[in-house]
Amino acid sequence: MLSQIRTLITILKHTFTRADTVEYPEQKPYLSPRYRGRIVLTRDPDGEERCVACNLCSVACPVDCISVVKTEKEDGRWEAESFTINFSRCIMCGFCEEACPTHAIQLTPDVEMAEYDRQNLVFEKEHLLISGPGKYHDYNFYKVSGKAINGKGKGEAHNEQSPINVRSLLP
C-alpha cells in the first residue's frame, strides 16, 4: 500500500513539471557554434579552390562516404575533378576536416538535410563549394606549402624558409 502511494505521488509530481522535449519545427534547439553538421568546400582568399585532391579526407573517413578524382593543371598543381560526398552514410565525425591540409573541408552547423529520396543526399563538388574562405580567412596553402610553382624554387614563396638539408642532420 505504501509503495502504491509513493508511486502516485511521483506521477503527480512529474505531471506538473515542465517538459524537457522541444517541438522541433516550431522551436529550433540551441546548437553550439562548434556543432558539426553539413560539409562544405571553401576557397582561398584569391578565389581559387583550396582542394588539392590529396585523398586524405577519403582515407580518414571511417564510413567511406567521400570520393575524390584528381587532375593536374598546366602549372603542376592538382585539383579535384570530382568531389562526391554521400551524406546518407556520413556520420559527421569531422575526421575529414582534421585530415585536410589545405582547410578546404569545413563543417558547418547546418543540420537540416532531410530528404525523401536517398539519391538527393549525394552531393557533388558544385553543390559543396562556397564562395568564401570559411573559418580560415587568410590561409593560402600554396603560399606556405613549399611546392615549387611558376618558376619559384622551394623557400622563395611568401613567409617560407629554405629547405633543410637532411643529410647534414645525420651523425
UniProtKB/Swiss-Prot annotation:
Lineage, highest ranks first: Bacteria, Pseudomonadati, Pseudomonadota, Gammaproteobacteria, Alteromonadales
PANTHER family, sorted: NADH DEHYDROGENASE [UBIQUINONE] IRON-SULFUR PROTEIN 8, MITOCHONDRIAL (PTHR10849:SF20), NADH DEHYDROGENASE UBIQUINONE IRON-SULFUR PROTEIN 8, MITOCHONDRIAL (PTHR10849)
Keyword Membrane: yes
GO BP terms in the entry: aerobic respiration
Domain 4Fe-4S ferredoxin-type: start-end pairs: 41-71, 81-110
Source species of the chain: Shewanella woodyi (strain ATCC 51908 / MS32)
Membrane topology: Peripheral membrane protein
Function: NDH-1 shuttles electrons from NADH, via FMN and iron-sulfur (Fe-S) centers, to quinones in the respiratory chain. The immediate electron acceptor for the enzyme in this species is believed to be ubiquinone. Couples the redox reaction to proton translocation (for every two electrons transferred, four hydrogen ions are translocated across the cytoplasmic membrane), and thus conserves the redox energy in a proton gradient.
Record's subunit section: NDH-1 is composed of 13 different subunits. Subunits NuoA, H, J, K, L, M, N constitute the membrane sector of the complex.
Protein name: NADH-quinone oxidoreductase subunit I
